[in-house]
């Protein structure tokens, strides 16, 4: 196990180097038919396209050269490709190129959008649907963590769905992903998913990336899915709802916080572990597997519990590099050598959160069949129910 971080480091660096050496400048319209824009933002856009040679739908992610360093583009693309063997992580087509204005890569298209679209505000998803989604996201995070990587931007906008019942979901957007233990600069601003240790403005020197921040965000995500609300606006003493939760976590009061009273004792035990105030005391995301067979909501029903096993090996890593080297990054590549996702008709979307915590903040364009769900609101009045 001690050699795993070194293996991951070498492979990611090799993928980045290979991509940089083979990055071609192309005209998008020559190889793709643009169907529509899926989203746009400060850093770029995402288009739904049809590959003129393969005839397959895919999503092209465009990152503006003016605001994106080549190093950042290469890192996001390489990490995405490196993680794509996991069936619960968005798949890649092995296509990366540049235009005069953008760095571009292609990934699969999910027709049902993202998780944010289907969570009814102040209601939440039915418990069986939420459990299906949570189970798959937990597997994806366990896989990512087994590769010594931390996502750092877990939220509904970054979980793509392939049907409204969440029978198939995938984790996406690895622009913020870094190796565990890497030093990073402190980011100004917070979102409800930000762990308390990252909200501490008294620490100005930055911090080291840690798995526990993903665990915290995962716990908040679970709350949002089940309730349609955020538990707080920010994990800071100035937030009344967070402080109420802190008193309960520290067992200074026996009363369950008002917005947590809808949960069963079993699920509250799960939340205590996922949202431990001290990061070293947080459990891993796989802790949720032990609770899938129990009821989570006082007025809900239990979903089905299916055990899943993660198999991660260095052989799998080497196979990915070999596949990468056997093809060109160009969209003109022979289709027989291309890396194809496991299924067609997928969608990728970017984060809609305007927080500077994400390097990829996008506004989603209207779809042909817009979802009926409203936007999750984050004002204090809406949070406390």
Swiss-Prot record:
<keyword id="KW-0723">Serine/threonine-protein kinase</keyword>
<keyword id="KW-0547">Nucleotide-binding</keyword>
<dbReference type="GO" id="GO:0106310">
    <property type="term" value="F:protein serine kinase activity"/>
</dbReference>
<dbReference type="GO" id="GO:0004672">
    <property type="term" value="F:protein kinase activity"/>
</dbReference>
<dbReference type="InterPro" id="IPR011009">
    <property type="entry name" value="Kinase-like_dom_sf"/>
</dbReference>
<keyword id="KW-0808">Transferase</keyword>
<protein>
    <recommendedName>
        <fullName>Serine/threonine-protein kinase SBK1</fullName>
        <ecNumber>2.7.11.1</ecNumber>
    </recommendedName>
</protein>
<feature type="binding site">
    <location>
        <position position="61"/>
    </location>
    <ligand>
        <name>ATP</name>
    </ligand>
</feature>
<feature type="binding site">
    <location>
        <begin position="38"/>
        <end position="46"/>
    </location>
    <ligand>
        <name>ATP</name>
    </ligand>
</feature>
<feature type="domain" description="Protein kinase">
    <location>
        <begin position="32"/>
        <end position="297"/>
    </location>
</feature>
<feature type="active site" description="Proton acceptor">
    <location>
        <position position="153"/>
    </location>
</feature>
<keyword id="KW-0963">Cytoplasm</keyword>
<dbReference type="InterPro" id="IPR016234">
    <property type="entry name" value="Ser/Thr_kinase_Sbk1"/>
</dbReference>
<dbReference type="Pfam" id="PF00069">
    <property type="entry name" value="Pkinase"/>
</dbReference>
<dbReference type="InterPro" id="IPR000719">
    <property type="entry name" value="Prot_kinase_dom"/>
</dbReference>
<keyword id="KW-0418">Kinase</keyword>
<dbReference type="GO" id="GO:0005737">
    <property type="term" value="C:cytoplasm"/>
</dbReference>
<dbReference type="InterPro" id="IPR008271">
    <property type="entry name" value="Ser/Thr_kinase_AS"/>
</dbReference>
<feature type="compositionally biased region" description="Polar residues">
    <location>
        <begin position="328"/>
        <end position="338"/>
    </location>
</feature>
<feature type="region of interest" description="Disordered">
    <location>
        <begin position="328"/>
        <end position="374"/>
    </location>
</feature>
<keyword id="KW-0067">ATP-binding</keyword>
<dbReference type="GO" id="GO:0005524">
    <property type="term" value="F:ATP binding"/>
</dbReference>
<comment type="similarity">
    <text>Belongs to the protein kinase superfamily. Ser/Thr protein kinase family.</text>
</comment>
<comment type="function">
    <text>May be involved in the control of neuronal proliferation or migration in the brain of embryos.</text>
</comment>
<feature type="compositionally biased region" description="Low complexity">
    <location>
        <begin position="348"/>
        <end position="361"/>
    </location>
</feature>
<dbReference type="GO" id="GO:0004674">
    <property type="term" value="F:protein serine/threonine kinase activity"/>
</dbReference>
